[in-house]
């Protein structure tokens, strides 16, 4: 009778518990069909099934009501129902109740332990999950099955590396018991090892599985892609196909991602064929990944055709193609596609707006960018960090820093990306005010306790390089260490550049040597620093180190090396580099052509320079300037003028550097009238004369003896004359022997550059040439008092591809004693011959 009364109450509960009349009636039919037989095991199981049917859409309150009824009926000690209650409470978010049910169970079977461990995992309580499992392991009456072992592995995986040793210890048990060959356990082990970054262990488990499910293949392939082993993921995919496993959309999508990363166009085409073969072309998400693969492999036309053929395009499809246009620098096409989105009634999301704003920035399309900005405000996308960052970048690149700052001030939160965008915008323009504003933004960033990233410091280093502030650069470098940031390629290159610009090549080399990973960008930065600071020998020695490394020199490397050879006037070295360029097929690069022209000109070989010019694949204004300067340096003014005429006849407009070469050619050749004409021609082209042009004109007039006219030209300069302009006049005075004007020119040069020894030396030599020894002595004494040191003359010689430098009275060479002995012997022989 007790059982009968209990099941009458169960029947009433079922009627209340079921909201759908059809489901309730069907349940009642089952219970009424053969009531006495349902009182036993069958009845309990059916009641459990009823609870599960309603678990998906029931509230926690109803779980408590049913639980209460179970207690009233005296069924709370039933292990089967308790297991179901734990599961139901877990799904409803009532882990407190699930835990109480579990703790009050007098007997727990394997399902009880598995359910509780799984419930803890479901709610992310991985530590408690491990505690429950370890309690089961300590008091186990039943042998573990694949479900509880899998739940344990999931818990260890959720601990982010802290459960590594537990899995290692469990591994031996799995091997002994044979569970390591279970596809379910094995798949979770593979997932754990991949998340732990241990791809080798994951591969061992994967290869040992006798049978692999689609989930197993998916886990292994996607894990390889996430860990940057895209090539391995492709190999696994081909192995999957050989095993006649039919890949699902997720596997194909993952492999396509690998093809995009590599990039591997042929692989993408093969996956495309599989998509068509298995009839998955209607899967929009898969087709979106295929479009992304094509655009990342540079096949934008194929991606566009695929896009046009999609019957069910969604916003992601449009955004993917839009991003592809941006990545391939097809910014006009991106703008047209963005416009088409509105015609089709689509509302661009934050990613589409971010992509199109980047295209606007690249094209300096301020008007279109402003319209997109208006749309983001209307669509309430302005608070998104991607959009805000792109807006700041767009306005900054369009030279509208005021608008960029407005966006920053309105939306800036504790987001390092936005601060980086604003600092980058100010640093890019390079004027004093903008550079100081970049530093102010950084100070505000630190005041708000926002942790800077490496990109922050790269932008700041660009600002300090423009300011040529060594102290600021060292402070920034120190802060990078303080924040514990490791130098990457960009930060290392920026540090090398800034120290080189501040004439601190030792610090540049320290940064270079400390870089654990050096790519060619780092090497080229160091080469450029040495060449810019005339440390050409160091550049050549470093090139020998590069040849011993894994990196291979590119056109920028050889451009620096050819320039270094030219600065050393070593035609032999220059020709060796030229031969290497021919072997590598780099001689057609415009950077290389210009460097070769300059090198041959400095080495006194204008004929070879002209040959390099004639063999150039394309001649830009820099190339023409180089050959004109080559003729100028060798006093062939007429040829330089002829090249200028030929240049203009080919439709290439000269720039201010062109006229520096032309005026220099006229000066060296004594072509005064031609020089004056070219100076006027420069003004017709709208080129304002700069210091270099005035130096050439003063030199031209000074060599012709027109010193007063040269002085008048200097006094008419719109800006304060630099020291080099006065030194040019001083040189003319030395040739003409005009002491009075020389004194004036020297004083003006010294006022402009007090530490330059050239002006003192030239004035002293003028006095000496006139026999004014007292005045010459006073100049030398003044140099000592003012701490002006004349840079000693140097000479160099290349022996066995090694450059040896010698200074006046220098004994630092390792074989100095032998060298001076030979020199003394030569002097004795010379005197004997004379």
From Swiss-Prot:
Gene3D superfamilies in alphabetical order: Tetratricopeptide repeat domain
Cysteines paired by S-S bonds: none
Pfam entry (one): Eplus_motif
Superkingdom classification of source: Eukaryota
Entry-linked SUPFAM superfamilies: TPR-like
Region (Type E motif): 725-800
Extent of the PPR repeats: 78-112, 113-144, 145-181, 182-212, 213-247, 248-282, 283-313, 314-348, 349-383, 384-414, 415-452, 453-487, 488-518, 519-553, 554-588, 589-619, 620-654, 655-689, 690-720
GO molecular function terms listed in the Swiss-Prot or TrEMBL record: RNA binding
GO biological process, one term: RNA modification
Alphabetized UniProt keyword annotations: Repeat
Region (Type E(+) motif): 801-831
Family: Belongs to the PPR family. PCMP-E subfamily.
Name under which the protein is recorded: Pentatricopeptide repeat-containing protein At4g39530
Species assigned in the record: Arabidopsis thaliana (Mouse-ear cress)
Gene name for this UniProt entry: PCMP-E52
